[in-house]
Regions:
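Long, compositionally biased stretches
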Residues: 1-71, 90-97
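Core nucleotidyl-transferase/polymerase catalytic module
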Residues: 75
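Short alpha-helix capping/helix-loop boundary micro-motifs
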Residues: 78-85
Length: 98
């Protein structure tokens, strides 16, 4: 819960509980990111956060220090449920503006 409170204080949005993982055609390294430190939320890894747009909606890429995902997969958080709101299914193609 604490990470959601930190996110709210930094962005003003209340996160939907859950993430949307997007596989990109090429690897992606975060740019212009900010960090939620492990000490801030009581975790074991820093979390890197970069703003983006998914289907024209404001969202954030989150990546932990030691992510289990390949570098061409980005994990998205937002205040909306993309799967429900846009009827998304696995393997769908969507637009992401980074």
């Amino acid at each position: 819960k604490k990470i959601e409170n930190i996110f709210y204080s930094k962005t003003g949005i209340k996160l939907f509980h859950g993430t949307l993982n997007i596989e990109l055609e090429t690897p992606y390294e975060l740019e212009n990111y900010w960090i939620i430190g492990k000490d801030e939320y009581g975790g074991t890894q820093d979390v890197y956060v970069q703003e983006c747009k998914v289907l024209k909606q404001k969202a954030y890429i989150v990546r932990s220090e030691k992510t289990a995902h390949k570098s061409n997969v980005i994990e998205i958080v937002s205040d909306i449920n993309f799967r429900e709101n846009f009827n998304l299914k696995d393997e769908d193609y969507i637009s992401v503006k980074i």
